Amino acid sequence: MIMLIINYIYVINNCIYYKFLLSYLYLYCTVSNWKKYLIFFIKLEDIKVIYLILYKLGYNIINELFFRGK
């Protein structure tokens, strides 16, 4: 079973930095309302692969980050 573990999360200057066990996912904020506009840079073939794996593991990263408490 493939396990993606988030080692640490930094939130500095409206930017989010995730370090995964297998690869890196950079979310750079481009505007002040960073929850709506993000640029994704990833060192994998397809970002959908990571999203689907996380979703299968029960971790909906989008809802967890941006829609918590709504």
Curated annotation (Swiss-Prot):
Keywords: Plastid
Superkingdom of the source species: Eukaryota
A Gene Ontology term for the protein's cellular component: plastid
Compartmental location: Plastid
Name of this protein: Uncharacterized 8.7 kDa protein in rpl22-rpl23 intergenic region
Organism per entry: Euglena longa (Euglenophycean alga)
